[in-house]
Amino acid sequence: MGTRCLLVLLLVLLVLRCDVQGDDMARQDEATGPTLLSQMQESLYSYWGSAKAAAQDLYEKTYLTAVDEKIRDMYSTSTAAVRIYTGILTDQILSMLSGDS
């Protein structure tokens, strides 16, 4: 009976040692190798960065200062016109609400 207990104890210790050793190896694998999620994240970031750089290059190649100035001028004149007509409309509404004839 003593040999059986010794054999069972030896097997239990062997299984525990293998389990602990397996956990250590799994931790080392996780620490050294990137996970699938991090690999996918890195590839998506690289694709995004390359697409962003390509769009920036295309914008810089097609950028025309004359067109930019025209757009700014059109914006300023249209906002000035809208501001004037909004003021006129506001005055009309206020005069209708106040009842002045």
From Swiss-Prot:
Protein keywords: Chylomicron, Glycoprotein, HDL, LDL, Lipid degradation, Lipid metabolism, Lipid transport, Secreted, Sialic acid, Signal, Transport, VLDL
Keyword Glycoprotein: yes
Example of a GO cellular component annotation carried by this entry: high-density lipoprotein particle
Subcellular location: Secreted
Stated role: Component of chylomicrons, very low-density lipoproteins (VLDL), low-density lipoproteins (LDL), and high-density lipoproteins (HDL) in plasma. Plays an important role in lipoprotein metabolism as an activator of lipoprotein lipase, the enzyme which hydrolyzes the triacylglycerols on chylomicrons and VLDL.
Family: Belongs to the apolipoprotein C2 family.
UniProt name for this protein: Apolipoprotein C-II
